[in-house]
Amino acid sequence: MARPIMIMGCSSDAGKSFVVTALCRHFANRGVHVAPFKAQNMSNNAAVTPDGAEIGRAQYLQALAARIAPQARMNPVLLKPSADTESQVIVMGQVDHAISAMPWLERQPRLWLIVREALYSLMRDYEQVVIEGGGSPAEINLRTSDIVNMRVARECQADVYLVADIDRGGAFAHLLGTWHCLEVEERALVKGFILNKFRGDRALLGNAMEWLYERTGIPTVALLPMVRHTLPEEDTLHHRAHPETQQINLALVVYPYASNLDEFDPLVHEPGVTVVPICGCERLDAYHAILLPGSKNTVASLRYLRQSGLAAEINRAVQRGVPILGICGGLQLLGREIHDPHRLESGDCPGLGLLDLTTTLVPDKTTRQRQVPWQGTRLGGYEIHHGQTQAGEGVQAYLPDGLGWCQDNVYGVYVHGLFENAPYRQQFLERLGWRGQTTGEWSAVVDASLEQVAQLIVESGWII
């Protein structure tokens, strides 16, 4: 196989995931059997592979870009923050309670063996592996515990490319400074610089790329423009307003440890629909519906809702008849009680009491893809949760098989990804008064964006 390609960034959110995704589709379009890899990801936005493994959403998308099935070995270690100093550790797609309980530095030797094995298995099975780094390789304080950046590059002798976000400013200083922080043998692996999110005329750069080359001997191989696309962000929500046609305002309550926010992207991109992240107490009078996303720590999220005053606002909205939809952790928040006998989070806690449900958190995690019967069709989605929920007499089934309940204008479901299904999205919005036609199945929208970003690689002139 060809030497692995590794994309590292000068900072978080420089564009590493974006470039890896574009490269995966670029290689796939050329007929190359390509696979993505990220040794360790930290995110509460997770996805479920066909065989029930849990990986980061970014690597899931990159696998789709490569036109292959997502696999656990593409993201062998996933850290899901559940408190300021705590993370659940997902190893090869499954929760590892023993490693989760270990101090950070004690974990790394064990995790490195797993990372190394996953990487080499991909290198054996694919013609090309495109690797994503984490954060920045210039974090000197993290060098001894590194299992995601230069240690990976040295292990497989990858061709490394450093990417910087030029839209933020300071890109050339970031590239030069990052390169200077690398060891001599690590600099030898760096084959090029990438400037991401460039706006305007290339002439505005003047001789900056030549200046950088004179000091490093490293060429700038690609200048990627700022583009609007529908690809999900790794840890945030797309926020796009449609002021001319605005009909529906949706409030998305973003509490601490909120997860899988990208599943609301299909709503964001519908004409006339605005999804507004609510990150502090504010009046919810102006919204047609309120959305409660998943949570990695439902008890902490409940505490936040009560302390911020949002719990009272949500209750007032329910009394006015505003529809409330909670997904996964959001469902659990809406119930009467959350029992935590194993102290997976923070102990027992009363819920908002808007659904007659009682949830018990258990060590075994449910992770699986689902096809849910719904009004003569099937809705694709996935489950990721520790909770087992018992329904009382006050609720009715909203989805079959214990996957969702409703009580008056309050709805709760365990299935993520429902809004990716055009029929469900259409009906949800129409019930709020929306008069439009959906953009269609979300998978087709995303695939069109994958083609769009892959074309940027071609147009950049990057020979790779």
Task: Briefly describe each language-model feature range.
Residues 328-329:
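Catalytic nucleophile serine of serine hydrolases
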Residues 335, 339-342:
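Extracellular/periplasmic helix-exit of transmembrane alpha-helices
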Residues 344, 349-368:
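Conserved P-loop NTPase catalytic core
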Residues 332:
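A Zn2+-metalloprotease active-site environment signal
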